[in-house]
């Protein structure tokens, strides 16, 4: 990476991000603007992918809401995310869990590991 770009982005990186991987269940506290008010909206689900590096690193969280799968993609170092909580660690053998989109109910469960 260009040293100039690297020096500019180092100040933007957040240090309060917990370690999480695909398969982990996380609770994301996202700031949402509604009119003139700003509030925290909690989005809890399974991390199905994590891609990119540095300031442009992103992760995708999937949850089932009302029987419908909902996915949201967040940048890791965005100020729009207040905090990320890791609820449980899942045991998976893939980096991208896109196959969970086709599974329903008990088939979509991920085994928990103790860390």
From Swiss-Prot:
One of its GO terms (biological process) is translation. One of its GO terms (molecular function) is structural constituent of ribosome. Coiled coil: none annotated. GO terms for cellular component: cytosolic large ribosomal subunit. HAMAP family: Ribosomal_bL19. This protein is located at the 30S-50S ribosomal subunit interface and may play a role in the structure and function of the aminoacyl-tRNA binding site. This is Large ribosomal subunit protein bL19.
